[in-house]
Amino acid sequence: MIYLWVGVAGFIGAAMRYGVGAAFYNADAFFPFSTLSANLIGSFLLAWFTIGLVQHRQLPESLKTAIGTGLIGSFTTFSTLSVETVMLFERGSTAAGVLYVLLSISGGLFTANLGYALGGRKKTE
């Protein structure tokens, strides 16, 4: 049954990823901003989910796996980042390729840290 939940959540995450890609797509952009946006949002969400929902609330393992691996895992796109970076270098856009990788890694760490910090806050009651 877990495969079904991961698959359903993965379908939703992939559809969300497509929506972000369509919303942020710009053919004239210096580098692929749509992929960067999806990966930064996904880094934040996975960290927030991991600390905020998993550690502070009782959730079934199947739901944790479906959301973390299925939904958020299909939303983020490391393979697309890799291919787009190679394409930037191949067409001679070295500065854009380097900037894209640096922003992806540093931005991902920053948004993951932010999600972790916000998810770890205890609610005042």
Task: Walk through the language-model features, giving the residues of each.
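Membrane-interface helix-loop junctions in multi-pass transporters/channels
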Residues: M1-E125
